[in-house]
Amino acid sequence: VTGDASLDCIYQIALWSRLANRLHLVLFSGQAYNNQILYQTCQQFPWQTVFSDQSAFKVHFHGTSNALRNEMYAGQVVKDAIVDHFRHHTGHRPSVDKDADIQVVAYLKYDQVTISLDLLGYSMHQRSYRTEQGMAPIKENLAAALLWRMNWPKLAKEGYDFADIMCGSGTIAIEAAMMASRMAPGLLRQDQAFHHWTHHQPSLWEKHRQAAKAQVVNPNVRFFASDTKGFAIEQAKANAARAGVGHLIEFSQRPLHQIQNLSEKGLLLINPPYGERLGEQLDLIPLYKEMGKIFNEHFMHWEAGVLTSDPMLAKAIGLRAHKTYAFFNGSIPCQLYCISVNPDNHLRQTDSGHTQMLANRIQKNLAHLKKWAERQGIECYRVYDADIPEYAFAIDKYGEYVVLQEYMPPKKVPE
């Protein structure tokens, strides 16, 4: 997203954006046909109007071309141009440091370079409260995006409660509480890079900070977060306390089968495990079936959101999703399944006896063949070969890939 912004607007974004990843100020664009032209383009810019020669800086360079094939080398060219500019105009040179006050970002595309200043100096998902994290943490801005897609700000105003029954380090519940409290995520940090920017106005920034603090409210919402692992709950409690919402969230350690009815209406949002390998996915089917059962028994009239990478696992829940949204959890493409839990959205029978037999057979074959393949150093082998006549296909595993091939049907099928 690009646009024009005043200093007031920049400070508002730094304080209030829950979804953004970086906040960059574009300084200039110019030609970069080769390293000499890149140097000239960057050396002639008035860098002393951006930061002082007393500040340390570093350069991030992204992109290559036929002439500039190495990002590290191109970044060094930009760095040299900046240093030489300061030396010529001020008689001093700024230092270069990996933990620099100022971060210059260069993007090269089609022999054109765009130079920007990273106004914060860190990814905006790093709110600073999550120093404790579980095995598969979800980024704060992704958690916030899921909540926005589930209309959580609107639901919170209408008195809906919130629950995450697989909370891990508590990120989703914490972001939900911060949203409902109208707490600006930027208030949690005071180390923004723009403090070293020449156009920074400390008094104006403090004015916006105080205005943001004044907007914090005590929401009329109950927050529930649980997990099967005790250490995860302790981590989540510590994270929530650092975020300033620990007093709002009821944390508990409990397995899924001990989940009880919480309230009449609310939003349930979870990020359950989703295996990236065939065997792992099949092992997770019972968990997703149990989730569907729990939704029906304990979350009737709630809105539910489930983030998963596998449509097969989503189908195992047994409830119809009225909307899906595409996301990336890190490098994994996922879908957010939005489900209204109500009497009309019945729990469907997701498989027959035969399909359960098929799943059991594939799991059994995998358990046996996986150990054998590891001992033999083999990555390619057949997992299933029409073992059950009703499912006449073969499944072959090639490293991380799976190929399914259907057998030709017989010319005549006996009546």
Residue ranges and their predicted role:
Residues 107-109, 329-331, 375, 385-388:
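A short catalytic or substrate-binding loop motif that flags glycine-/basic-rich loops and adjacent residues
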